[in-house]
């Protein structure tokens, strides 16, 4: 693409101005994880553990049945994207457990 020059005609005509950068609107932060929410969720996970379907999905992930685990979780949580997120979360938990076991030995 050609270099843009300030000219009187064409797409770049007119005065040279600096772009007014506005800060993101408050409504854009919906769904973002806060420190407090993360703390509460971690506390609940520590107290309650995993749901039965999550434990079964973790067993499937342990034996490298990733696709089967995804289908199983999708059936339980409803949507493909939520299932992928849940599978990722559970595989991260398994990796952390493996890491902790290796560190302990």
UniProtKB/Swiss-Prot annotation:
GO terms for biological process: translation. It is found in: Cytoplasm, Cytosol; Cytoplasm. GO terms for molecular function: structural constituent of ribosome. One of its GO terms (cellular component) is ribonucleoprotein complex. Keywords: Cytoplasm, Ribonucleoprotein, Ribosomal protein. Component of the large ribosomal subunit. The ribosome is a large ribonucleoprotein complex responsible for the synthesis of proteins in the cell. Belongs to the eukaryotic ribosomal protein eL36 family. Component of the large ribosomal subunit. PANTHER family: 60S RIBOSOMAL PROTEIN L36. This is Large ribosomal subunit protein eL36.
